[in-house]
């Protein structure tokens, strides 16, 4: 069985779109776990109604389970961890309540994962204007590659449930939670983020699915939406957490990649006209390549992460 864990907070206006996509999911057995995070609108009632619908619907091709949990601790990560604690599936994946789930995603990913710990893939984002973009992804990404390209996003993988529990679940971050989570997912390293983390550090077995899945909706109040300067304080907190709490487990190359990524984000803030906010985002190092990346992005240059990745792979500009 695969458990699909979905945090929900005040999403009554997007839930029917989500439910419509979940009704088309072909894989069985599947367990949908909605974790209400203190909604003040009708979200929890709508989730419970959908769960009742699933219970009443006969399933000709295997078990279909759905449950609504309540998580009093605020934050999507707390809700995901509550769902992870509850999950009964051998495998699990995570999703957001304002997006659309691909019907054959679980069937295809379950085939691809084989005996691996994690199966990665790519997802599709959709803007409010209707523009579509395929997120970065390729087989067997390195930690430093994820730091620059963000190969792991919330919806871009399935994994063994015991493995996700062992690496500590989700860290309590206000933004870019999947950026930090992806480091541990790819490496098998963990911090004692939660009680019960018992995994010895090891490299996980990774599988790859070549498909492009889901419709991830970007908007101002989504987890992934908004401008850089509006999220500057939260992004800065996420970077500091990664630098001091997570990257201490990795080699110097990972720290260099993080510095490049911070420089790129600083450039985006400058491009948006917010130079003071960019200065507040500490690089932690003075480096010519970082400065060049920042200036390039501030001038609205594109593909800076690819340039930075080339520097990393050539191993010419580290230190």
State what each model feature region is.
Residues 21, 36-46, 96, 102:
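A conserved acidic beta->alpha catalytic loop
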């Amino acid at each position: 069985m695969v458990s699909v864990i979905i945090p929900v907070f005040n999403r009554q206006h997007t839930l029917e779109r989500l439910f419509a996509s979940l009704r088309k999911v072909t894989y069985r057995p599947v367990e949908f776990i909605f974790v209400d995070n203190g909604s003040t609108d009708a979200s929890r009632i709508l989730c419970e109604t959908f769960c009742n619908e699933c219970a009443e619907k006969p399933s000709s091709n295997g078990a279909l389970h759905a449950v609504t949990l309540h998580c009093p601790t605020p934050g999507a990560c707390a809700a995901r961890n509550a769902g992870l604690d509850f999950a009964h599936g051998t495998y699990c994946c995570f999703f957001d309540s304002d997006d659309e789930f691909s019907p054959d995603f679980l069937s295809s990913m379950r085939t691809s994962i084989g005996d691996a710990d994690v199966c990665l893939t790519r997802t599709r984002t959709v803007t409010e204007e209707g523009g579509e973009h395929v997120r970065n992804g390729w087989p067997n990404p390195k930690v430093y590659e994820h730091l620059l390209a963000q190969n792991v996003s919330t919806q871009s993988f399935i994994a063994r449930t015991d493995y996700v529990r062992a690496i500590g679940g989700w860290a309590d971050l206000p933004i870019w939670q999947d950026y930090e989570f992806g480091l541990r997912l790819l490496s098998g390293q963990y911090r004692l983020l939660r009680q019960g983390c018992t995994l010895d550090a090891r490299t996980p077995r990774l599988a790859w699915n070549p498909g492009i899945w889901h419709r991830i909706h970007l908007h101002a109040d989504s987890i992934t939406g908004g401008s850089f300067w509006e999220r500057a304080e939260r992004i800065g907190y996420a970077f500091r957490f990664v630098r001091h709490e997570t990257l201490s487990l990795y080699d110097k190359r990972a720290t260099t990649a993080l510095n490049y990524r911070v420089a790129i984000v600083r450039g985006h803030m400058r491009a948006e006209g917010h130079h003071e906010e960019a200065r507040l985002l500490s690089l932690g190092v003075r480096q010519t390549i970082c400065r060049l990346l920042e200036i390039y992005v501030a001038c609205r240059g594109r593909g800076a992460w690819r340039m930075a990745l080339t520097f990393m792979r050539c191993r010419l500009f580290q230190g």
